[in-house]
């Protein structure tokens, strides 16, 4: 179906704004995925602060031109579903990866993060990035472990000196 020029310009502008504000992007092929499943994916993405859109390849190339996601141009072949993570860099990759487990026909093509192209087999790198809260929790557990170890060491030294003095 033909799209009017004004509509094409609006789509390019909308996707371009999303690309400029995004931390990462993931491109997938959703051919054969049911409407109900896609609706669920879009809902989950919206809740996670991920912008998802099916875009024609030519419009996608124009929309990402001049952004850090221009490196994804080679992935814009066939039906293209593009997702931009706005709040956490791994959000789109994590959502797409989980969705792909239940959908045989859903195929992740590529991703981009900080100007680097990630092939489909490298998506795990992006999907497993901890969120801010997870990273803080990991840091706190490391600090707490070191503090506990120091306290046990000092207590052992104290006990050793008390035993030697008695």
Swiss-Prot record:
GO terms for biological process: translation. One of its GO terms (cellular component) is large ribosomal subunit. The keyword Ribosomal protein applies. SUPFAM superfamilies: Ribosomal protein L10-like. The keyword Ribosomal protein applies. GO terms for molecular function: large ribosomal subunit rRNA binding; structural constituent of ribosome. Keywords: Ribonucleoprotein, Ribosomal protein, RNA-binding, rRNA-binding. It holds the Pfam family Ribosomal_L10. It comes from the Bacteria. Forms part of the ribosomal stalk, playing a central role in the interaction of the ribosome with GTP-bound translation factors. Belongs to the universal ribosomal protein uL10 family. Part of the ribosomal stalk of the 50S ribosomal subunit. The N-terminus interacts with L11 and the large rRNA to form the base of the stalk. The C-terminus forms an elongated spine to which L12 dimers bind in a sequential fashion forming a multimeric L10(L12)X complex. This is Large ribosomal subunit protein uL10. It comes from Azotobacter vinelandii (strain DJ / ATCC BAA-1303).
């Amino acid at each position: 179906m033909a799209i009017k020029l004004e509509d094409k310009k609006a789509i390019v502008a909308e996707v371009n704004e999303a690309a400029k504000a995004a931390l990462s992007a993931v491109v997938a092929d959703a051919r054969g995925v049911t409407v109900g499943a896609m609706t669920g994916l879009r809902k989950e993405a919206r809740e996670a602060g991920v912008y998802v859109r099916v875009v024609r390849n030519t419009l996608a190339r124009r929309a990402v031109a001049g952004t850090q996601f221009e490196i994804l141009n080679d992935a814009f072949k066939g039906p293209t579903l593009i997702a931009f993570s706005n709040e956490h860099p791994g959000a789109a990759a994590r959502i797409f990866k989980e969705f792909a487990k239940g959908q045989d026909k859903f195929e992740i093509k590529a991703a981009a993060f900080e100007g680097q192209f990630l092939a489909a087999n490298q998506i795990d790198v992006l999907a497993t990035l901890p969120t801010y809260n997870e990273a803080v929790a990991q840091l706190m557990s490391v600090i707490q472990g070191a503090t506990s170890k120091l306290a046990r060491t000092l207590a052992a030294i104290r006990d050793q000196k008390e035993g030697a003095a008695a």
